[in-house]
Amino acid sequence: MPKFKSFLFDQNIFVEFADVIRNTPLLLAKMHFSSVVLYELAATTISAGDLDLYERWRKVHDKGNTLLTPDKTDWWETAKMIRRLKFGDKSASHGLTPKLQHAHQLQNDALIARTATLAKCYVVTKDVDDFQQFTAFLPNLEIVSEREFFG
């Protein structure tokens, strides 16, 4: 079990487990919400009803101070992390990192990982491997698969 008590869902969890999340208000009440995930959900939604739902979630989490939004430092540190992954640079704690061809595609996941770590939240995702790459730079990052979380 993760050491952090609070959690946030990656965008793919909202897609895969939409009905469970919508029908379990306690989940939403106990979690933090990433503005990056909110952006991904809003930008890809087709339904006006879903967009209204996301707006309500945004307001609730903003009011509850559980909406995690990257600041200028997060953007800068994330850019450096992606650069290191892309070029296979050394990390402070893990030495050389393997070069990635798709590092630029990981920007949103990196922002989610960084803000979750700073807020002491674990990330629930289907893309454990993508998030695992960031642990060389975010040693306190905790990642939980959807199977582990939902059983």
Question: Can you say where each PLM-predicted feature lies in the sequence?
Answer:
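Short, hinge-like loop/turn segments at secondary-structure boundaries
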Residues: 48-53, 85-86, 141-143
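Alpha-helical elements of the RecA-like P-loop NTPase motor core of helicases
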Residues: 16, 43, 76, 132-133
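A short acidic, often aromatic-flanked loop/helix-cap motif at beta-alpha or helix-coil junctions
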Residues: 39-41, 73-78, 147-151
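Short acidic-hydrophobic, aromatic-tinged amphipathic segments that line or gate anion-handling sites
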Residues: 65-73, 142-148
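Short, well-structured N-terminal submotif of metal-dependent ribonuclease cores
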Residues: 1-60
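Active-site neighborhoods of divalent-metal-dependent phosphate/nucleic-acid chemistry enzymes
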Residues: 67-129
